[in-house]
A protein has these predicted regions:
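Conserved GNAT-fold acetyl-CoA-binding loop/helix
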Residues: 28-49
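Soluble sensory domains of the PAS superfamily and closely related sensory modules
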Residues: 51-53
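Acyl-donor (CoA/ACP) binding surface of acyl/acetyltransferases
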Residues: 1-31, 57, 61-185
């Protein structure tokens, strides 16, 4: 469990299903379209999948209300496709209920998560992808001190166009090294 002044980052529990359904009923960006949930039963099944994920996957809980308002997780890279052991590089993913945007919760959660990754898990490098239209995520990456490393044109498709063809999105990559993170404090 990770605590900040206003938040608790903790593993998911079965009781989180209703709160998670609220923000995954209508994902705000296409990269989360595959995570869309339609019913409480689907959300409960999703919570069961998340129960064993306690090291890099956390519910973001608002302390004042006890409500799950989002999630943050990290995906350690493997050294090679043949190896299962993670390297010292992680790609985080964060998602927040739309009612909690613009309140600094994403920044607060990401700062705590980055501290956890760099200090507790010994991570050397964190990189994140975001769509070119997701300006709030780009702003968050920059506020975290991440540098923009590149723009990948028509990089990936998460959804289809109305005619059924893939909708390829432009993706921006941001990154920060542990020494850069430590130097910003």
């Amino acid at each position: 469990m990770i605590e900040t002044p206003r938040l608790i980052l903790r593993p998911f529990s079965p009781e989180d299903a209703g709160d998670v359904l609220e923000y995954l009923r209508e994902p705000l960006v296409n990269c989360f379209a595959c995570m869309k949930l339609n019913t409480l039963e689907e959300a409960q099944a999703e919570m069961q999948k998340r129960l064993p994920q306690t090291e890099y996957c956390f519910a973001i809980v608002e302390k004042a209300s006890g409500k799950v308002i989002g999630e943050i997780d990290g995906h350690p890279e493997s050294a090679s496709p043949e190896e299962k052991a993670p390297t010292d590089t992680v790609s985080p993913c964060w998602m927040m209920h739309k009612d909690y945007h613009g309140k600094g919760y994403g920044y607060e959660a990401a700062c705590a998560f980055f501290d956890y990754l760099f200090v507790d898990k010994g991570i050397r490098r964190i990189y994140a992808y975001t769509e070119d239209y997701n300006l709030s995520c780009q702003h968050l990456c920059e506020k975290l001190g991440m540098r923009r490393e590149g723009l990948f044109l028509e990089f990936v498709s998460f959804v289809n166009n109305p005619n059924g063809t893939p909708l390829y999105e432009n993706t921006i990559q941001y990154a920060i090294l542990k020494k850069e993170w430590e130097g910003r404090k």
